[in-house]
């Protein structure tokens, strides 16, 4: 008996949407990365991108536990000398709420080309309106 290995041409991808209202950031990001990698499928293969497309709505209503709302700091660098910038979770959620989920999920995906292709299947929106209605996404309960 041989081990079954799926070909990239035979991968079937579905569209799902998740409502992030009152969800904990880390738990949601963990579940999203699990589905983006395709580990919920029986034909999961570590070296292929077998995951599904996921749309996250209401990213501005995500929750964090403890004092992270005040104390969590996001860093980025401009590329110039001394150009390290920081912003707190409260500032980030008010100005760019979709980036909070994107940063959390990106850290849980594999590093490299495969992880980048998985990350491209994540679509995050700060409110209920999204532009992927034509794909007929199904609700994913997380």
UniProtKB/Swiss-Prot annotation:
GO molecular function: mRNA binding; structural constituent of ribosome
GO cellular component, one term: cytosolic large ribosomal subunit
Gene3D superfamilies tied to this protein: Ribosomal protein L13
Top-rank lineage group of the source organism: Bacteria
Keyword Repressor applies: no
Disulfide bridge map: none
UniProt keywords, alphabetically: Ribonucleoprotein, Ribosomal protein
GO process terms (BP): negative regulation of translation; translation
InterPro entries cross-referenced by the UniProt entry: Ribosomal_uL13 (IPR005822), Ribosomal_uL13_bac-type (IPR005823), Ribosomal_uL13_CS (IPR023563), Ribosomal_uL13_sf (IPR036899)
Family of the protein in this entry: Belongs to the universal ribosomal protein uL13 family.
Subunit annotation: Part of the 50S ribosomal subunit.
HAMAP family registered for this protein in UniProt: Ribosomal_uL13
Cited NCBIfam families: rplM_bact
Function per UniProt: This protein is one of the early assembly proteins of the 50S ribosomal subunit, although it is not seen to bind rRNA by itself. It is important during the early stages of 50S assembly.
Protein name: Large ribosomal subunit protein uL13
Organism: Buchnera aphidicola subsp. Acyrthosiphon pisum (strain APS)
Name of the encoding gene: rplM
């Amino acid at each position: 008996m041989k081990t079954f290995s799926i070909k990239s041409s035979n991968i079937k991808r579905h569209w799902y949407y998740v409502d992030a209202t009152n969800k904990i950031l880390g738990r949601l990001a963990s579940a999203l990365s699990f589905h983006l990698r395709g580990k919920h499928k029986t034909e999961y293969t570590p070296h292929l991108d077998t995951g599904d497309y996921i749309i996250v709505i209401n990213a501005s209503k995500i929750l964090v536990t403890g004092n992270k709302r005040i104390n969590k700091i996001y860093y980025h660098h401009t590329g110039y000398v001394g150009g390290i910038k920081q912003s707190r979770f409260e500032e980030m959620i008010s100005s760019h709420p979709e980036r909070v989920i994107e940063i959390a999920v990106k850290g849980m995906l594999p590093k490299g080309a495969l992880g980048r292709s998985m990350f491209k299947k994540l679509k995050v929106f700060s409110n209920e309106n999204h532009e992927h209605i034509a794909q007929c996404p199904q609700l994913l309960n997380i």
